[in-house]
Design a protein with these regions (language model features):
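Structured adenosyl-cofactor binding patch, chiefly the S-adenosyl-L-methionine
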Residues: 197-235
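Active-site/ligand-binding-proximal alpha/beta "capping" segment
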Residues: 161-201, 205-212
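Hydrophobic side chains in well-ordered alpha-helices
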Residues: 28, 92-96, 199
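RNA substrate-binding interface of SAM-dependent RNA methyltransferases
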Residues: 72-162
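Fold-independent oxyanion-binding glycine-rich loops
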Residues: 7-8, 45, 86, 151, ...
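N-terminal positively charged helical leader segments and presequences
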Residues: 1-72
C-alpha cells in the first residue's frame, strides 16, 4: 500500500477529499494506474492522524476516497535533532538527509563549519532536499516529515539543548550520561577531516564528545550511524 504525505485535505463524514494536489493525483493515475476501489493511505506532514482510504471518485483536479480506517496521532515522544556540517558534495548531503528521514530524525539543521566545502544552500537545492524527505517519509511510513533549516552558526541552538558532538577519535574525556539528561539531545556531525578548534568554540559549555572508537569513517556513514544511535538512545 502506498502512503502519501499530503499537506492539505478535507475530511467530511467517512470521506476524505484532496484538491489542488496535481502531483499526487497524477501519481495515482499514471504511475500506480489506480482504479476505483484502489486502497492507499494519506497523512499530513505533521504527526497527526493517518487515513487508510479506498478511492471512489477522481478527476484531474480532485479525488474523493472512502475512509476505511483512521489511526490516531501518535503519542508525543522526545524529539531527535541533528546538526550536520555541510559535506563536500551535494550527493552526500542528499543521501544523509534521506537516511536521517528514514531513521526518524525530527529536525535537521545544516551548517557550514570551517572545513565545509559547501558554504550555503540555494532555494532550489533546499526544495530538492524537501522532496527527498517527503519521498523517504512515504517510503518508510514515518509519522511526520522532518523540519529542515540552514543556520549560520550553532549558537542559535544553544538554548535548552544538550549537544552531543560526534567527531574523530579523541583523547578528550567525555561522559555517557546523555540518556539521563533532562535537556533534549542534539547530535552534531562534523565534516570529513573533523571539526576545528574554532568550530568547538561555537558549541555551548557542557557539550559531550563521542567517537566510534578508532574507526575513521566517511562522513555519510558516520552521520547515519550516529543518527540511529541518538534516536535509540532517546527511545
Amino acid at each position: 500500500m502506498q502512503l502519501f504525505i499530503c499537506p492539505e485535505f478535507q475530511v467530511s463524514g467517512n470521506q476524505l477529499i484532496i484538491k489542488r494536489n496535481p502531483e499526487l493525483i497524477q501519481q495515482l493515475r499514471k504511475v500506480l494506474r489506480a482504479q476505483m476501489g484502489y486502497q492507499f493511505a494519506v497523512q499530513a506532514p505533521e504527526a497527526t492522524e493517518r487515513y487508510f482510504l479506498r478511492l471512489q471518485k477522481r478527476s484531474d483536479q480532485e479525488l474523493q476516497a472512502e475512509i476505511v480506517q483512521m489511526l490516531p496521532a501518535p503519542s508525543k515522544a522526545p524529539k531527535t535533532w541533528m546538526l550536520l556540517s555541510l559535506p563536500n558534495k551535494q550527493e552526500k548531503l542528499e543521501l544523509i538527509i534521506q537516511k536521517f528521514t528514514e531513521i526518524g530524525v525530527d529536525e535537521i539543521y545544516l551548517w557550514a563549519s570551517e572545513r565545509s566545502v559547501l558554504k550555503g544552500i540555494n532555494p532550489n537545492k533546499l526544495q530538492r532536499l524537501s522532496k527527498i524527505m517527503q519521498e523517504a517519509t512515504e517510503q518508510s511510513w514515518n509519522r511526520s516529515l522532518p523540519k529542515l533549516t540552514f543556520i549560520e552558526a550553532p549558537q542559535s541552538l544553544h538554548q535548552e539543548r544538550k549537544f552531543i558532538v560526534f567527531d574523530l577519535p579523541s583523547t578528550q574525556q567525555h561522559t555517557t550520561s546523555s540518556k539521563a539528561s533532562a535537556l533534549p539531545l542534539l547530535g552534531v556531525v562534523g565534516p570529513e577531516g573533523g571539526l576545528t578548534e574554532r568550530d568547538y568554540q561555537s558549541f555551548p559549555d557542557g557539550f559531550e564528545r563521542a567517537s566510534l572508537w578508532e574507526s575513521v569513517l566517511r562522513m555519510e556513514t558516520a552521520a547515519i550511524i550516529w543518527a540511529w544511535k541518538l534516536k535509540n538512545l532517546k527511545n
